[in-house]
Each structure stands twice: as structure tokens, then as C-alpha cells.
């Protein structure tokens, strides 16, 4: 809602202490489905002087390409942002698919748009690493660092292809 979004922006402004504590106004965009688990992105804005009236959410579209289109339109209006994919190790291969959302081959336009809007990726957090997996990096002695096979005592059925940055 506008009220919750306004409060998010206000909280970022109130907590900001130049040179001591940096805050960002942002939110989490989730586009998970039963087939595409754990598709989370943190969307962070540069400054709070120019902000969208409301964030782009799964109510607008669950397709991350829709998020990127929206971010590009916001950028044309002087509103800078970036999306940071995270928890890709739990995406069941959907975070870094070799096709677009609709199954079409990735082309240069897709790659450019994704890089423009998602220049960073979260590598490691409490839910495990999203860097690589021993099945993907057989010669990397550190590939088994923080592999997280369980989620809430349930086996994590996320396959390595498409779930890790170094795929």
C-alpha cells in the first residue's frame, strides 16, 4: 500500500547518518511459483528524492522481465534502482535459466537488460551459498562451502543447474 511504501522510505531517511550508517529504500520482489521456487530479488533505490509512487510487485507480474521493464521506465524518469537476486541456491534452477521466462532463447537484448538491472548477485547468506556447487565446479576445492541441502528440515529439491552463479 502507499502507506507502507511511504513508511519504508521515511524509515530509510530517518535512519541515515552520513559517514556513519548508510540506508537504502528498497523492498523484496518475489516471483516464486510451485515450479520456480525461491525467486527473490532485493530492489534498492539510489536516494529517496525521486521514488516511484508504489513498488513493482508480484501483483503487477511474477515475471522478473516485467520488473526489469519497469526499472528501465523508472530510470527514464530519473529514478535509479538495481535488483539483487538472492537465495538462488533454492530456486530449483529458475534464477539463472538458459532461457527467458517464457522459454525462449536468451538473446543480446535480454542479456543487456538483465545486466543493466541486476549487476550484482548475493553469493552467501545464512540459507547457504549461491556461488557454485560441487557438481558444477568439480575442480574447485571450495565448491562445497555452505551447501544448504535442507530448508526447515525438508530436503531442498533445488537442482544445481541454473541455481548457482558459476553455472
Please state what every model-predicted region is.
Residues 1-167:
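Extended, charged catalytic domains and RNA/DNA-binding interfaces, predominantly
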Amino acid at each position: 500500500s502507499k502507506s507502507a511504501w511511504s513508511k519504508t522510505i521515511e524509515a530509510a531517511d530517518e535512519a541515515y547518518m552520513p559517514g556513519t550508517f548508510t540506508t537504502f529504500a528498497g523492498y523484496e520482489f518475489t516471483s516464486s511459483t510451485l515450479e520456480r521456487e525461491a525467486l527473490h530479488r532485493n530492489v534498492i533505490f539510489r536516494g529517496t528524492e525521486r521514488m516511484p509512487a508504489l513498488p513493482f510487485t508480484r501483483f503487477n507480474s511474477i515475471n522478473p522481465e516485467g520488473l526489469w521493464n519497469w526499472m528501465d521506465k523508472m530510470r527514464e524518469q530519473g529514478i535509479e534502482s538495481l535488483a539483487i537476486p538472492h537465495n538462488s541456491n533454492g530456486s530449483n534452477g529458475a534464477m539463472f535459466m538458459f532461457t527467458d521466462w517464457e522459454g525462449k532463447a536468451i538473446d543480446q537484448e535480454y542479456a543487456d537488460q538483465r545486466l543493466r538491472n541486476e549487476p550484482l548477485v548475493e553469493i552467501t547468506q545464512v540459507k547457504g551459498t549461491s556461488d557454485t556447487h560441487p557438481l558444477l565446479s568439480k575442480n574447485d576445492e571450495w565448491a562445497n562451502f555452505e551447501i544448504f541441502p535442507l530448508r526447515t528440515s525438508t530436503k531442498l529439491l533445488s537442482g544445481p543447474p541454473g541455481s548457482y552463479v558459476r553455472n
